[in-house]
Amino acid sequence: GWEGCFFQAGSCPGTCTHVWNYAQTVANLFPRLEQNMRETEFLRETDGQGKMNFRAKIQLEGKPWDMYPAVDGQLGSILRVYREWKISGDDDFLKKIWNQVVSALEFSASYWDSNQDCVLDGQQHNTYDIEFYGVNSLGNSIYYAALKAGAEMAEYLGEHERSQKWRSMEQAGCKRMDEMLFNGEYYRQVTDGDIDEYKYQYGEGCLSDQLLGQTLAHLYGLGHLFPEDHVKSAVFAIYKYNFKERMGSHKSLQRGYAYQDEPGLLLCSWPSGGRPKQPFVYSDEVWTGIEYQVAAGLIYEGFLQEGLEIVRAVRSRYDGYKRNPFNEVECGNHYARSMASWGVLNALSGLQVDLPHNSVTISPKVNQDCFSSFYSTGTEWGICRQFKDQSGALIQSFEALYHAD
């Protein structure tokens, strides 16, 4: 798939892994299509060493691609294998690509972790179209979520030794990263030497994507990766420092997606100073896909009103008067990252689908005594409800309106 579309052509081909990392809509509405994407990524675009192309160059052009792997895209694809398996309950799908999943995760552990201390610190290409250096929580949080998901899949497949290895790496890495990066309020970036030795870093900044891996872990039923109080502090700091009720005098020399009296969430800010001379290029921009994933993260951590305020901010900009309400723009129209919006729905309903273990549950964050919402799995869709019966007990029900044969 394209990332977006221009007026005469598509924008950025090849189902870019680090952009589709955010998208939740297709997996929940067209799950077999997402399975096909994972098959392409692991069976076609991952080489014998486990390095994955973050664009489907082999599938589209029939030739290798001499480009860095993307840390967030590659590790996110492993997480999405877990998501697709949980949503569908399709063991054959998992077994078909499992060897390449193992290869991709082992490659990540060796390629980006220079001293094998379970913390990624190498040159990390990412969704901002640059490389981060040193230790940052964007790549590492996705790494630990991928290790935790990998351990669960390995255990299910009977690979107990591998499962224990990855689980130990995840636990050790989470503890070490938290100790290295948490500054008492949020997770920063640490590099060797002066932050300005490298272009396009963020250092002491409050990155909106700093806990992307944690949000994905919540969406996919993996729970907290880091101390809960630290996570709550960090996600609230993102709202506190990066959300602007009006852009006003905010200065940006990059693309403009929010103006003047419009609200929006910046990709990064430096509340205590320390802004690099050349921070990553998009840091002053507003991206709807990141706004939605932060909103979902806030809702999961109990900041319901703050999460909904960010969603309302997006929709106030795309109100049908100033902008097309069905076309949220980033690098092109109808941008794929915006499909992070479905994650907000699942955060509000608390939907968790685990078909390999025959489980579908909800944990609503709103209207707990009288809740109803759309739900979907890999085999059916319908209406889920939670309500109190005459005795005051909470009852959940799932009314399937469609079930696949």
Descriptions of predicted regions:
Residues 4-169, 174-177, 219:
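Substrate-binding cleft of carbohydrate-active enzyme catalytic domains
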Residues 1-8, 32-68, 110-135, 178-287, ...:
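Extended glycan-interaction surfaces of carbohydrate-active proteins
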Residues 156-205, 213, 218, 222, ...:
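Repeat-solenoid scaffold signature
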Residues 31, 87-90, 156-159, 179, ...:
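Short, well-ordered loop/turn and helix-capping segments at boundaries between secondary-structure elements
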